[in-house]
C-alpha cells in the first residue's frame, strides 16, 4: 500500500474510497429491495381480490356426457393413495368411465392399492397395466404412453396420483371441452395437508403463493399454464399434437402439452374448478427438493415470468432492505409487507374454505419460498422419484444415474 492509504497499481482508489463505494452500493441495493417489496404488497392485495372473484365464478358442467378414460400413472404407495384414487371411482357422471392405472414394476406397492380398489368397487371399469418399457427419460409420460394404449374412449383425463376430487369432478372438467375452439381443459389446485410442519409449509406454498400468482398472471394475460392436477382432451387432439411421445423427454410435460395445443390453434380452458393436492412431505429435505424442482421447472419454461415473480416475496425483500440499509423510517415496509401477506392469506382461506394457519407460519413460509427462489438459479439438476436428472438447454431430461436417499418420499406430479 502506498502513502496516504492509496492502493498501488495506478487505481487511484484508497480504502476510504472503497468504504464509500460499499456504503453507497448497499444503500442502492436497500432501496431496490424496498421498491420491490412495495410492488409485492400491491400484488398481494390485488391477488387476494382476484382469487375471490375466480372462486365465485360459475362452472359450466357437461350437457352431453361423452365416454371418458381416466389415465392414472402410479409409483409407490404414497400416504393416502387409496383414498385419493377412490374419489375417481365414485364420480356422479352418467356416461361410461374407464379408469386405467399403471405402474412400471411388478413389485410396486401401488399394485396392492389398486387391487383393493378393484375389490371395493367391483362395478367400476378399472384396469391395471404393469409395463416396464421405457419410451424416454420422463418416467411419468412413459407410463402414460403404456396406459393410453388401453384407453377405449375418446375423451382422456389425466391426473396425478396425489390429486383429490369431488364426485362432480368429471362433469365440471369435461363440460368445457364442448366450447368452440377448446382443445384442452386443465384446473388449479389447493392443498390437502397431512399433519405436521412440513406438510403445512407445503400447503401454504400452494394456497398462498402458487394459487394467487397463477390467478394474477391469468388476469394480466401473462400466464399460459397447464397443470398435471388435471388435463382433459380428446384423442384426436392428442394425435394432432404428436401424442405423448412428443413430450416423453420433457421436464414440464404438462406445460408442454398445453403449449402444443395452443400452437395448434386451440384454446386451453381453465374453469373455476379447484381440486386438492395431497401434501405428505415427511422431511425438510423432501420439501426443499420438491419445491426446488418446481421452481426450476418454472424458470426453465418461463424465465422472464419467473424472474418477475421475485417481487412477490415482499416480506423477505423488505427484511433484506433493512439488513442492507439499517433501521430507518423505510423499515416500516417490513410491517406493511407482513400485513399485506396476512391479508392475502385471510382472503384466500376464506375464499377456499381453508382452516387458517398460525400467523407465524406465514413469515416462515415466505422466507423459505424466497430461499427456494434464489436457489433455483444455481444449477440445472432436479430430483424426481429418487432419480436425479440434468435439464438440458431444450428443457429435456438427461438421467444422471444418481439416486437420492428417499426414493419414494416425494409426491408424484410435476408442479408446473
Q: What does each of the following model-derived ranges do?
A:
Residues 116-149, 153, 172-241, 245, ...:
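Long helical/loop segments within the catalytic core of UDP-sugar-dependent glycosyltransferases
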Residues 22-27, 35-39, 49-51, 60, ...:
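Membrane-embedded multi-pass helical conduit in multi-pass membrane proteins
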Residues 144, 153-164:
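Short beta-strand-to-loop acidic/aromatic patch adjacent to the donor-nucleotide binding site
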Residues 85-135:
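Acidic donor-binding segment of Leloir-type glycosyltransferases
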Residues 66-69, 98, 256:
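Cell-envelope/extracellular polymer assembly enzymes that use nucleotide-activated donors
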Residues 19-86:
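N-proximal low-complexity "stem/linker" segments adjacent to membrane-targeting elements
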Residues 249, 255-277:
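Catalytic donor-sugar/metal-binding loop of nucleotide-sugar-dependent glycosyltransferases
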Residues 109, 159-176:
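Acidic donor-binding/catalytic loop of UDP-sugar-dependent glycosyltransferases
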Amino acid at each position: 500500500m502506498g502513502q496516504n492509504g492509496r492502493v498501488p497499481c495506478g487505481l487511484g482508489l484508497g480504502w476510504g474510497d472503497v468504504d464509500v463505494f460499499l456504503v453507497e452500493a448497499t444503500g442502492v441495493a436497500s432501496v431496490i429491495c424496498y421498491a420491490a417489496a412495495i410492488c409485492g404488497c400491491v400484488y398481494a392485495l390485488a391477488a387476494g381480490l382476484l382469487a375471490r372473484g375466480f372462486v365465485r365464478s360459475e362452472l359450466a358442467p357437461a350437457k352431453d356426457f361423452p365416454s371418458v378414460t381416466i389415465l392414472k400413472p402410479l409409483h409407490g404407495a404414497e400416504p393416502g393413495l387409496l383414498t385419493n384414487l377412490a374419489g375417481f371411482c365414485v364420480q356422479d357422471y352418467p356416461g361410461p368411465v374407464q379408469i386405467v392405472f399403471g405402474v412400471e414394476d411388478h413389485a410396486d406397492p401401488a399394485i396392492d392399492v389398486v387391487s383393493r380398489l378393484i375389490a371395493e368397487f367391483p362395478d367400476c371399469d378399472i384396469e391395471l397395466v404393469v409395463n416396464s418399457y421405457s419410451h424416454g427419460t420422463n418416467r411419468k409420460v412413459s407410463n402414460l404412453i403404456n396406459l393410453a394404449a388401453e384407453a377405449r374412449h375418446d375423451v382422456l383425463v389425466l391426473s396425478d396420483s396425489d390429486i383429490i376430487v369431488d364426485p362432480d369432478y368429471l362433469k365440471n372438467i369435461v363440460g368445457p371441452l364442448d366450447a368452440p375452439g377448446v382443445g384442452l381443459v386443465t384446473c388449479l389446485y389447493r392443498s390437502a395437508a397431512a399433519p405436521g410442519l412440513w406438510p403445512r409449509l407445503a400447503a401454504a406454498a400452494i394456497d398462498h403463493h402458487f394459487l394467487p400468482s397463477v390467478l394474477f398472471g391469468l388476469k394480466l394475460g401473462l400466464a399460459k399454464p397447464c397443470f398435471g392436477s388435471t388435463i382433459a382432451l380428446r384423442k384426436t387432439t392428442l394425435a394432432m399434437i404428436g401424442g405423448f411421445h412428443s413430450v416423453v423427454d420433457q421436464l414440464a410435460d404438462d406445460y408442454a402439452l398445453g403449449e402444443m395445443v395452443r400452437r395448434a390453434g386451440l384454446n386451453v380452458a381453465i374453469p373455476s374448478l379447484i381440486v386438492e393436492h395431497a401434501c405428505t412431505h415427511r422431511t425438510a429435505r423432501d420439501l426443499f427438493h420438491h419445491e426446488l424442482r418446481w421452481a426450476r421447472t418454472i424458470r426453465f419454461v418461463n424465465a422472464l415470468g419467473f424472474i418477475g415473480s421475485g417481487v412477490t416475496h415482499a416480506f423477505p425483500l423488505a427484511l433484506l432492505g433493512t439488513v442492507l440499509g439499517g433501521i430507518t423510517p423505510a423499515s416500516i415496509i417490513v410491517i406493511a409487507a407482513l400485513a399485506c401477506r396476512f391479508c392475502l392469506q385471510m382472503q384466500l382461506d376464506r375464499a377456499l374454505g381453508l382452516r387458517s394457519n398460525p400467523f407465524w407460519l406465514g413469515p416462515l413460509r415466505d422466507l423459505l419460498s424466497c430461499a427456494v427462489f434464489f436457489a433455483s438459479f444455481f444449477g440445472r439438476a432436479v430430483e424426481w422419484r429418487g432419480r436425479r436428472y440434468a435439464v438440458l438447454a431444450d428443457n429435456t431430461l438427461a438421467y444422471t444415474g444418481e439416486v437420492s436417499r428417499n426414493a419414494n418420499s416425494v409426491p408424484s406430479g410435476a408442479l408446473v
